Amino acid sequence: MLNCRFGGMQLSVKTDTDAYLIAPQPGLARLTRAVTGRDQTGAETTINVVEERPLTIYLNAQEIVTAMTIGDYPEYLALGFLRNQGMLRDGEDITSVDYDEELEVVVVRTARKTDYEDKMRKKTRTSGCAVGTVFGDMMEGLEGVILPTTALRTSWLYDLSAQINRTPSLYLEAGAIHGTVLCQGNRPLVYMEDVGRHNAVDKIARWMLSEKVDGGDKIMYTTGRLTAEMVIKCALMGIPVLVSRSGFTAWGVEIAQQVGLTLIGRMRGKRFMCLSG
């Protein structure tokens, strides 16, 4: 059980027009910036571009990582990242989570003393943007992981793709951003966006942990590539199905086959490719 304090956290409210528990917030002014330029005809035009700001994550007194993020859910990103990297344990007693907007820092404090110097030396840069770091024992954590077999209907995939594509989002507003959606059946539940696809996954991981949501009957939908990093995080979150409109990497497919994860890519309209599961 987590015991956390959050400051300044504002969640989206479910509306009559969608079924999301948390939905994108494209209307938040601090997430985009108006920039003026010229188009191909030379005409002056103003467009919105996504903000990108650093967020440094501390665990107790130790600096862990600096991530580039849009800054909408800093506490969720920090806790989800630490959880997915194995730095926060199941049932961890988290005494406080403090976010300083001016310093762009989140400090997570636990009752347990922590020291991850050895772990930090084993980190591996991945193909992910913004953070792109996997620690060695995160991959070791996959040993013995076999995901549950779950029913999956093609109609769910078609419904999810259509619903997600028409949801108002920062991607539709400004582009240059990734989206990740936690789904159940044909219903999208939590939709997170960020400049790094793994950031969006980490935010969802934090939500699942706080709400005690089991991943065994869930589907993860992402706009990003199906890389090893994405597959590892999905597997460690206990989610047996990972879907993307984008393509695969060989290592991602190999790990998915190892843990029994259903991996579906190139999801466009009613076309897709399944390489594992």
What is the predicted function of each stretch?
Residues C4, G8-G185, V190-Y191:
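Intrinsically disordered, low-complexity regions enriched in acidic/Ser/Thr/Pro/Gln residues
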Residues D194:
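Flexible, glycine- and charge-enriched loops at secondary-structure boundaries
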Residues R197-G277:
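Feature captures the catalytic cores and cofactor-binding loops of soluble hydro-lyases/lyases
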